[in-house]
Amino acid sequence: MKLRNLLSAACVALFTSTPLFAGDVMVMDAYARVASKVAKSGAAFMMLHNHSDQDDRLISAASDVAKRVELHTHIEEDGVMKMTKLKDGMIISAGGMHALKRGGDHVMFMGLTRSLEHGDMFELTLTFEHAGDVTLTVAVDLERQ
């Protein structure tokens, strides 16, 4: 394995394994993907754990890697899966967990301002209704299924 690939893998492992807190909400295992080097869009996935005794809501996300950053999900409509914007955000139940995963809820990056390659890292700010803002470093992991 080349040294660059080894270092990239180590950085991805380090940054995706370190949990961060926004108030009582813990963000874990964050990573991003793009379909190809020339993709105009990408997505981020992670696990959110609400340690408080009240529901919270992820209401927005922001990053300089894209012109627009939105909260999205997939829905089935007439037998066809479609991606749609979540206008009201994502609820994280009190004491519960919420997975942002492929084929489900996720952070969508549209109009990428730069290419995202395996091992790259960028900042993403998540805004929660009660817990406030948390800025995390997200690693691009194109090998993850």
Give the positions of each predicted feature.
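Bacterial N-terminal signal peptides that target proteins for export
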Residues: M1-A10
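N-terminal signal peptide c-region/cleavage motif recognized by signal peptidases
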Residues: T16-A22
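Compact, glycine-rich, soluble single-domain proteins
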Residues: G23-Q145
